[in-house]
């Protein structure tokens, strides 16, 4: 069937901020789909609240809206743009939920918008647990016994009837949010209560447990003519009971018999037929009882998903692109296979290799959270590796995670960790075999299939053989074929990694590169997409004779290093291509645009380790390697690449080293007459206490060479310092701990700057909204700044110019400054792209990373900027010619942009929500407005924390904050809010003439502050941290992964209750001040104003 001619304009809803369960895979899917729809001749409108996405770049659509993803904002966009159709299957759960709401409220009918890609009825059948169960039973498919309940009493009765354990699944939530496994009544009460709050429709499904069964997924595609293909089968190494996003998964499935696979395939067709999926991709999950062979359907997603991104990368079959074309009427036999260029999309992919995905966790960022894995997803990212065998792929995937070795435990602890899965589970399986446990015993505790366990046990037996045959060439070859890295072999043999590399080179033991081609080499692939293997002879990655640049990606998403760096990488690739270079991308993350088959000229899906990168360099011989775009991961290996004579493009390694080494950096600042906060370094607890005593408390403690403020803290007492130093020493062994004097009440600024060696251009000058001391990645920020004088801005420009010239920056860098008493202090300089580059690019309308990349290959900065000149500058600054001075004019947009963060606290009940110098956010949103108040209010809505305009406020403010907080609370009272406060805060408010109701703290009488929150009487909580209230910290003592120190105070109880009840909360005076301005703006009139992104640049 040809494409539909009755629709011309299509609205696509993005997935919003990166959260656990909904990450970069939707930017990858969305970008792919937008390209496909545009190439088919449609006009496309995209709306997303996340600026750090390629899909919101103007070149991919006809109109881009960076606006909150709510029905109110979407209706305004529909009214303005008048699309003919809405495609909701590319933006994850967020887009599906919004499509349902727009349809049910009659908005789609009102403006004549059709749903394409999935019918409303189909979405409901797939998403509504009860309807899904009924539909499956009608189709003759077995599902688990289950019952939908909307109250605790029914849940308890159902669980008694089914027998414990039971699984609780809240309706319409993402990544299993609010769900879990209850082994007894007490756990059931807790999970159901939370689940009913988390579910937007306040229902949960109570389901019989199939803990320990095997879990499989099929990625399927169907077209309007009824053609149906299975793109990929995926097997979860972890059994049922662990969310598939937290499971290690393997493709294709390894332990299914052909008969079982055919049964599953037939069932998958019946599922999508019964649900009514006429076009597009779906993911269907099955559970299989290994003892009886009983197979049940667990669930299906009628959209592209995390698994479909994985299946696309694993097979080379672009599911999102195909799904988008099917949605507009094409059939599978009309869509080419883009990898081979010869076959059609109706051919099922076949693969002659094994793919392993492993999730990346960061539970140490959330002290107090339960580390056990269950049906609620907790991982923040994932890696994928490809090998000719399961062993090889597993070895490569494990080293892609960039994790340290697991703590050594005794057998008792190992058994406990096997029975109660935690993120380190795979390490404990290996540890069990090292300690002499057999396959049967490990299987009983973990329910991992015996085939996988035998493979893993064989690896441990190989380690024993390696110990016995030191420097044996044949055993070295075998270890490489089984996925062992040079570093692992070096550790077993007690030598350096370099020595193993030399031994390999002397004996000509090198990997070959094979192609991912969707057809097991039956047809020649047109798109060079490679993986390495030691199990092969022919090298398929034959290098061209073009001049090449190799870009190192950022590896798995994690806190502090997310999608923002992938955005920069992709822009870098495009720039180098425009300058005539062949681009080589190296990355291990299946969720990203950078690992799409058609982003770079050549893609290597490989771990980002020294060994793997050097092997690609040996094969490709690039002109140079770019380490400045992938966050900290490439920077960590830059030193070793330079030692091997690899050319680093852009800022030199010497400059990188100066910026990363505090002593060298402080010396440089002194030479050029710039200030930094007084500091010292310490290699022991005694030394640290001495340094802090000299500086005076409070001090900021941090390890060297980390990203995202790992193990960073503000410390007020010697006791706290001792505790933190022990933690920091674990994080960065061999590197001293850095201790800075903490600048209280300073304004923090973030500067993204570009230089070609001569000219210096501040692309973005951002003011942090949170107080100094909150990690810049966790603070909201505003561009342009709102509280800097003209004189101060000029001084900042001079300061940045001096520093950039001294560091010899070529390309992009990020500098953090603090301003206290009109003095400028340099906090740190990062000689690489920062996480704010996409935000700045969207705020000013100039692609910062593209310009930086071109500079790295010799282009001139004023010449590159002239394309965008004249751009708005500060009021009163008139610029006729760009290169009048070596300091190029700083952009000063007329519209205000606020970047707000999203932190997954609700996934980790028990964690304190206080912000500090350790970063914990997973994603971000952007709010754009005519003034700061409008931009801030929109950013709060986009982040899922809309500020109230009426109701009651609970205030409990620390003594140190009362002077500034009381007038702000008085403003809220004047606006009609009812104020409740604890005794001390109430007294301060009453002395300012504010009417207030006093509420007892916990233990001072009932109803107390917690009762008030639980009763739903409060619409906003204002609570700042008192200095005698220590934060909970994760401390690693080497024995256990981590434990929590600190005490759970009343403040902690209030904050966690507000989080649980979904009541907006403010924990600093700065955020209160911004909120007061935003609420005042909202009271004056609607802020539901929508503007095309490109229009905001012209104002």
Curated annotation (Swiss-Prot):
Binding site for Mg(2+) 1: 285, 299
Residue numbers binding Mg(2+) 4: 828, 830
Positions that bind ATP 1: 129, 169, 175-176, 208, 210, 215, 241-243, 285, 299
Keywords: Amino-acid biosynthesis, Arginine biosynthesis, ATP-binding, Ligase, Magnesium, Manganese, Metal-binding, Nucleotide-binding, Pyrimidine biosynthesis, Repeat
Gene3D superfamilies the record matches: 3.40.50.20, ATP-grasp fold, A domain, ATP-grasp fold, B domain, Carbamoyl-phosphate synthetase, large subunit oligomerisation domain, Methylglyoxal synthase-like domain
Cofactor binding, per record: Binds 4 Mg(2+) or Mn(2+) ions per subunit.
Residues binding ATP 2, per UniProt: 702, 741, 743, 748, 773-776, 816, 828
Pathway where this protein functions: Amino-acid biosynthesis; L-arginine biosynthesis; carbamoyl phosphate from bicarbonate: step 1/1; Pyrimidine metabolism; UMP biosynthesis via de novo pathway; (S)-dihydroorotate from bicarbonate: step 1/3
Region Carboxyphosphate synthetic domain, residue ranges: 1-402
Residues annotated as binding Mg(2+) 2: 299, 301
SUPFAM superfamilies linked: Carbamoyl phosphate synthetase, large subunit connection domain, Glutathione synthetase ATP-binding domain-like, Methylglyoxal synthase-like, PreATP-grasp domain
Binding site for Mn(2+) 3: 816, 828
List of residues binding Mn(2+) 4: 828, 830
Region Oligomerization domain, residue ranges: 403-541
ATP-grasp domain mapped to chain residues: 133-328, 666-857
NCBIfam families: CPSaseII_lrg, PRK05294.1, PRK12815.1
Similarity remark: Belongs to the CarB family.
Function: Large subunit of the glutamine-dependent carbamoyl phosphate synthetase (CPSase). CPSase catalyzes the formation of carbamoyl phosphate from the ammonia moiety of glutamine, carbonate, and phosphate donated by ATP, constituting the first step of 2 biosynthetic pathways, one leading to arginine and/or urea and the other to pyrimidine nucleotides.
Protein name as annotated: Carbamoyl phosphate synthase large chain
Organism this protein belongs to: Thermotoga petrophila (strain ATCC BAA-488 / DSM 13995 / JCM 10881 / RKU-1)
Species lineage: Bacteria, Thermotogati, Thermotogota, Thermotogae, Thermotogales
């Amino acid at each position: 069937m040809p494409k539909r001619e009755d629709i011309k304009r299509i609205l696509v809803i993005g997935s919003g901020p990166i959260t656990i369960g909904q990450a970069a895979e939707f930017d990858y899917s969305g970008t792919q789909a937008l390209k496909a729809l545009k190439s088919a001749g449609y006009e496309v409108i995209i709306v997303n609240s996340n600026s750090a996405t390629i899909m919101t770049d103007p070149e991919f659509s006809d109109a881009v809206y960076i606006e909150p993803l709510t029905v109110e904002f979407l209706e305004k966009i529909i009214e303005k743009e008048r699309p003919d159709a809405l495609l909701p299957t590319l933006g994850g759960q967020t887009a599906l939920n919004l499509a349902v709401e727009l349809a049910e409220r009659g908005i789609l009918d009102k403006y004549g918008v059709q749903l394409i890609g999935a019918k409303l009825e189909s979405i409901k059948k797939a998403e509504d647990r009860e309807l899904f169960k009924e539909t499956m039973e009608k189709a003759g498919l077995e599902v688990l016994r289950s019952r939908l309940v909307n109250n605790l009493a029914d849940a308890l009765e159902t669980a008694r009837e089914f027998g414990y354990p039971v699984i609780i699944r809240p309706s319409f939530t993402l990544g299993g949010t609010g769900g879990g496994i209850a082994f007894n009544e007490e756990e059931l009460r807790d999970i159901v209560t939370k689940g009913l709050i988390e579910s937007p429709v306040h229902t949960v499904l109570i389901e019989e447990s199939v803990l320990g069964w095997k879990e499989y997924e099929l990625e399927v595609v169907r077209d309007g003519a009824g053609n149906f293909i299975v793109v990929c089968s995926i097997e979860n190494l972890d059994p049922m009971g662990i969310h598939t996003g937290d499971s290690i998964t393997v493709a294709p499935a390894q332990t299914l018999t052909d008969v079982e696979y055919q049964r599953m395939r037939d069932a998958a067709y019946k599922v999508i037929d019964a649900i009514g999926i006429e076009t597009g991709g779906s993911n269907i999950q099955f559970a299989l009882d290994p003892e009886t062979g009983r197979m049940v359907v667990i669930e299906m997603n009628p959209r592209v998903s995390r698994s479909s991104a994985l299946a696309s990368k694993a097979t080379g079959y672009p599911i999102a692109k195909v799904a988008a074309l099917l949605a507009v009427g094409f059939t599978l036999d009309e869509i080419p296979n883009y990898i081979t260029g010869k076959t059609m999309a109706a051919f099922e992919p076949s693969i002659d290799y094994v793919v392993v995905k492993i999730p990346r966790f960061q539970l140490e960022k959330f002290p107090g959270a339960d580390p056990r894995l269950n049906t609620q997803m907790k991982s923040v990212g994932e890696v994928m590796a490809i090998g000719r065998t399961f062993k090889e792929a597993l070895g490569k995937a494990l080293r892609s995670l960039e994790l340290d070795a697991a703590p050594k435990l005794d057998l008792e602890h190992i058994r406990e960790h096997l029975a109660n899965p935690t993120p380190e589970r795979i390490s404990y399986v290996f540890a069990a075999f090292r300690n002499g446990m057999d396959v049967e015993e490990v299987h009983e505790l973990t329910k991992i299939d015996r085939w996988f366990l035998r493979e893993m046990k064989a690896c441990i037996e190989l380690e024993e053989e390696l110990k016995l045959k030191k420097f044996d060439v044949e055993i070295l070859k075998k270890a490489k074929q089984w996925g062992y890295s040079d570093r692992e072999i070096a550790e077993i043999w007690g030598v350096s990694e370099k020595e193993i590399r030399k031994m390999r080179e002397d004996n000509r033991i090198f990997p070959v590169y094979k192609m991912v081609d969707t057809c097991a080499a039956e047809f020649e692939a047109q798109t060079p997409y490679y993986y390495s293997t030691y199990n092969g002879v022919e090298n398929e990655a034959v290098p061209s004779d073009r001049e090449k640049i190799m870009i190192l990606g950022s590896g798995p998403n994690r806190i502090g290093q997310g999608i923002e760096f992938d955005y920069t990488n992709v822009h870098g690739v495009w720039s180098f291509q425009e300058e005539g270079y062949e681009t080589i991308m190296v990355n291990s993350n299946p969720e990203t645009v950078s690992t799409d088959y058609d982003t770079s000229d050549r893609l290597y899906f490989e771990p980002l380790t020294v060994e793997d990168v050097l092997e690609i360099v040996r094969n490709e011989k690039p002109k140079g390697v770019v380490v400045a775009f992938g966050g900290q991961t490439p920077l960590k290996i830059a030193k070793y690449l330079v030692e091997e004579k690899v050319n680093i493009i852009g800022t030199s390694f010497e400059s990188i080293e100066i910026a990363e080494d505090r002593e060298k950096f402080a010396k440089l600042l002194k030479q050029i007459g710039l200030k930094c906060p007084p500091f010292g370094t310490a290699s022991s607890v005694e030394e640290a206490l001495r340094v802090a005593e000299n500086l005076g408390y409070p001090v900021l403690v941090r390890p060297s060479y980390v990203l995202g403020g790992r193990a960073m803290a503000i410390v007020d007492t010697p006791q706290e310092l001792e505790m933190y130093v022990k933690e920091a020493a674990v994080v960065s062994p061999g590197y001293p701990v850095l201790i800075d004097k903490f600048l209280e009440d300073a304004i923090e600024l973030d500067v993204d700057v570009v230089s070609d060696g001569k000219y210096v251009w501040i692309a973005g000058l951002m003011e942090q909204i949170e107080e100094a001391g909150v990690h810049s990645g966790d603070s909201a920020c505003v561009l342009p700044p709102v509280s800097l004088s003209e004189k101060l801005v000029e001084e900042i420009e001079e300061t940045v110019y001096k520093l950039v010239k001294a560091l010899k920056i070529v390309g992009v860098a990020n500098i953090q400054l603090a301003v206290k008493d009109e003095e400028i202090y340099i906090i740190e300089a990062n000689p690489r792209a920062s996480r704010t580059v996409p935000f700045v690019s969207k705020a000013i309308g100039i692609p910062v990373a593209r310009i930086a990349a071109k500079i790295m290959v010799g282009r001139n900065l004023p010449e590159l900027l002239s394309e965008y000149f004249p751009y708005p500058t500060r009021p009163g600054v008139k610029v006729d010619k760009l290169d009048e001075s070596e300091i190029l004019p700083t952009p000063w947009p007329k519209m205000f942009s606020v970047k707000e963060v999203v932190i997954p606290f609700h996934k980790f009940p028990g964690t304190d929500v206080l912000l500090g110098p350790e970063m914990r956010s997973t994603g971000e949103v952007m709010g754009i407005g005519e003034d700061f108040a409008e931009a801030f209010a929109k950013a709060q809505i986009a982040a899922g924390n809309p500020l109230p305009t009426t109701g009651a406020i609970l205030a409990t403010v620390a003594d140190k904050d009362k002077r500034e907080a009381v007038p702000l609370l008085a403003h809220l009272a004047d606006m009609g809010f009812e104020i409740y406060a604890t005794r001390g805060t109430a007294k301060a408010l009453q002395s300012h003439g504010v009417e207030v109701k006093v509420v007892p703290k916990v233990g001072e009488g009932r109803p107390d502050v917690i009762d008030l929150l639980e009763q739903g009487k409060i619409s906003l909580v204002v609570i700042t941290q008192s200095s005698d209230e220590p934060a909970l910290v994760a401390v690693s003592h080497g024995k256990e992964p981590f434990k929590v120190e600190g005490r759970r105070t009343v403040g902690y109880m209030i904050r966690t209750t507000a989080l649980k009840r979904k009541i907006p909360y403010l924990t600093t005076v700065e955020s209160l001040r911004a909120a007061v301005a935003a609420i005042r703006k909202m009271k004056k009139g609607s802020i539901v104003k929508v503007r095309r992104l490109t229009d905001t640049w012209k104002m």
